[in-house]
Amino acid sequence: MASILTLDGLYAEVPKFLPEALREGCAGKNPLSFYIQQILNLMGCDGNEYHVLFTSSSEEANTHMIMAAVRRHLLRTQQRPHVIIGAGEPPSITECVKALAQEKRCVYTIIPLKNFEIDPVAVYDAIQSNTCLACISGTNAVVKTFNKLQDISKVLRGIPLHSEVSDLVYQGCIKQNPPADSFSINSLYGFLGVGILGMKKKVMQGLGPLIFGGGLRGGSPNIPGIHAMYRTLTQQRPSIKKINTIHKLFMKTLKKHQHVYLPIGGVSAEDMSTKDMSTKDIPSTDMLVGPKGLPGYILFSVGHRAEELQKKIFTKFNIKIGRIVDLQEILFRIKIPQKYWETLLFIQLRDNLTKEDIKRVMVVLMHLDTITPRGSLPPPSYSSSFS
């Protein structure tokens, strides 16, 4: 990604592939029940209360849980089921729910972000008599902020909460039981084709045969991939203290230096004339409306490669309208000393950050936390600001 305001590099160390773990898994020394118990232990789960199903990915786990909850509701009542999802959920959740809605199998409500988090009060206000499931991830998929799952679970009052908790599990944030009725975890490798659908046994019993009869991946379990996931969780977890430090610094900096925004709802071509939008503010000619509920981004434009990375960002998040400014202008207006310019430029132009990169980022974040912006760039008139 192309700016210091993406947490993929700052937030946690990326787990490395362990070829020896894959070989150990191929040896088949441990039965499947061993991994079920060990992964439950790593999450602080009581084996008497939780059960684990291994799937081909977290995407399959998410889709399977949503389908089971919707089908159960349709079998039991004449009402069309209602699903609550948070803004910035993984595509496997949003696309599944939207596809069901197009088929008139369910209706849904998207909870917008407030201060980069899902507000439990907004979740409570969205509850309807036919609400059958809420899907709120442990970390926001866009800016990687923590969601208050425990508070959200309380306001749901018995409505099942499904959560994608890969980041929380890998970082060791869950000390005792995931604050959700069901949860999904990816392989931490992607290409190994293994994921987890975990759930409370009472939820599983309520779903009945639907949770098993929905067509889970056929064939024998991917024991080598499951073993590699287990080894990653036990050996490669980053320091939670370091993660929390970076996260707090990042959030303080993000809330303090608000300069350039992308519109949350997008802007139509008809609105351009009324809002004095300059054509130079538009990255390309084929503009579409951006998704609702996404937070703002700060995007820097320096050099040919940076522009290419920006196009990738716009494409990835389906955002087609935004103001792009010059990095030097940003740095000058918020009084960042020139000695830090190279670091920010370096971070912008790298796709993956190393441990040394993270140390350099920490220096910049700590400096930004000690200064007061002067003459910060105002948000464009057509754009929504952070709350």
From Swiss-Prot:
It is found in: Virion. Its cofactor is pyridoxal 5'-phosphate. The keyword Endoplasmic reticulum does not apply. Keywords: Late protein, Virion. Its main location: virion. Pyridoxal 5'-phosphate binds at S58, E59, S184, I185, N186. The keyword NAD does not apply. It holds the Pfam family Aminotran_5. Induction: Expressed in the late phase of the viral replicative cycle. GO terms for cellular component: virion component. Belongs to the class-V pyridoxal-phosphate-dependent aminotransferase family. NifS/IscS subfamily. This is NifS-like protein. It comes from African swine fever virus (isolate Tick/South Africa/Pretoriuskop Pr4/1996) (ASFV).
